[in-house]
Amino acid sequence: MLTRRFILGAVLAAGTLAASPAFAGGAHAFDAKAFAAAQKAGKPILIAVYAPWCPTCKAQAPILSDLRADPKFKDLVYFVIDFDSQKDLLNRFGVRAQSTLIAFKGDKEAARSVGDTKRDSIFAMVGKAV
């Protein structure tokens, strides 16, 4: 019985993560080595701080998916930080709220927004890193 519950829980958790809108459109869970490599290569980088219970994050998800599909952002490296489970990364990047978006141009922070759900301003903010 316990094994059955464990398996069911694992399947549901995996399904939730896979279906999470923030992971759509080419986003990757934050990886320090990949982030450092992208910075060293001078790539444009977007970090989205996401929580599955956050309505603002859910509103941002289709905009971020559209952004990734835009040819202007074809070289963008897109990472997601989980607000609930990656507190060390929140401290590293000075994040205090879910729905925070941070754009980097190489190793320099180019722009940051919190709680923005307007397509034009998100595109403009991330555009500062391109």
Where are these regions (language model features)?
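Thiol-based oxidoreductase modules, predominantly thioredoxin-like and allied folds used
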Residues: 73-87
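A short beta-strand-turn-helix
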Residues: 27-43
